[in-house]
Design a protein with these regions (language model features):
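Membrane helix-loop-helix hairpins that form the core translocation module of multi-pass transporters
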Residues: 23-91, 148-151
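Selective transmembrane alpha-helices of multi-pass membrane proteins
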Residues: 51-80, 138-141, 145, 153-183
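Hydrophobic alpha-helical transmembrane segments in multi-pass integral membrane proteins
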Residues: 41-44, 101-113, 171-183
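Juxtamembrane transmembrane-helix termini in multi-pass membrane transport proteins
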Residues: 1-58, 108-130
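Residue-level signature of transmembrane alpha-helical cores of multipass secondary-active transporters
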Residues: 31, 95-99, 131-138
Length: 183
């Protein structure tokens, strides 16, 4: 699930495109770190809060949808001059915090916790192991999206391709938001 399209991977593609792979590493690390913490807390029982209070899940979906709309709006026209980098990639803590309003991250975390956490082990060891493994698996998967973005950076000199990429990713973010809210 880490490698499939979603909010994190769309943002990483644009980060790789705008800032290159190396400068996107804090963003990648923040996602992996934030997700490991999220998985660990769900393994400790936080997932039951979402089950007991389904309204909270709806609130998370709408927060994520709003953020994705904001990102889509920011994305159009954001690739002004690929040689002059404006702005900055997300910092580790910003990417880690985004996981808490990302419904796909919640879905993955609950799936990982329910499907892969060894129940016969000591709880703390199992939680640490599950969180660590989640982070180790996610890192190369999400890194591929930033790498993809940095590779297509060379095509941005063509104005048509530049606009196409901007609008494509903006539309994909909006569609992802609609999918998250409607499901």
């Amino acid at each position: 699930m880490f490698i499939t399209p979603g909010p994190n991977n769309a943002m990483l593609t644009i980060s790789g495109l705008k800032f290159g792979f190396k400068r996107s590493l804090p963003h990648i690390s923040g996602i992996a770190f934030g997700h490991a913490i999220q998985v660990s807390l769900i393994c400790l029982g936080l997932g039951f809060i979402l089950i007991d209070y389904p309204g909270l899940q709806i609130v998370l979906r709408w927060l994520c949808f709003g953020y994705l709309l904001y990102l889509a709006y920011q994305m159009v026209g954001s690739i002004k001059d690929y040689k002059k980098e404006s702005g900055r990639p997300l910092k580790v803590y910003e990417a880690a915090l985004f996981q808490w309003v990302n419904p796909k991250a919640w879905t993955i975390a609950i799936t990982v916790a329910s499907g892969f956490m060894p129940l016969e082990e000591k709880l703390w060891i199992a939680v640490l192991f599950t969180g660590l493994m989640s982070s180790l698996v996610s890192f190369p998967c999400i890194s591929m999206w930033a790498l993809f973005g940095s590779l297509i950076k060379t095509m941005i000199s063509n104005q048509f391709i530049k606009k196409f990429i901007e609008y494509l990713f903006a539309i994909l973010l909006v569609l992802t938001g609609f999918y998250l809210v409607l499901n």
